């Protein structure tokens, strides 16, 4: 049985009766103090904070873990990162956030250099305008074009090439 809780924009609240992951890398009974939609502190049943007047939510024994990081995926819910649209990135980021992923670095395929530059530009523009309700776009996982044809997997061999510092610079410039 899986339970999901959605923390809406709130000034301060306590989520009690959850299983928290502690600094000593153990799961234990406790709770979470949330302030301005961010985790302010985590407590165990031995050190329950006294915060009268704050909103209290009963987690009903659910596990509460840090947000997950998705570093290698190409898309979801019918959207692909290589669709090269801010709408696709937004849909992907919102979906990822809805399943506990707070940080994303979606992957490209090995495409022509010009297409990759466009995708990187779109991602950079999205990052500047990013909707705070979706997972945070922190980078792009580029699967080429500088890969070995021997280990190409599903990548299009026509777009594979030796590393080229000028093209690397073009990718960096497009990402700004």
Residue spans for each PLM region:
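Histidine-rich, glycine-flanked metal-binding segment
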Residues: 11-13, 20-65
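Divalent metal-dependent hydrolysis catalytic cores, especially in the metallo-beta-lactamase
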Residues: 74, 90-119, 135-148, 175-176
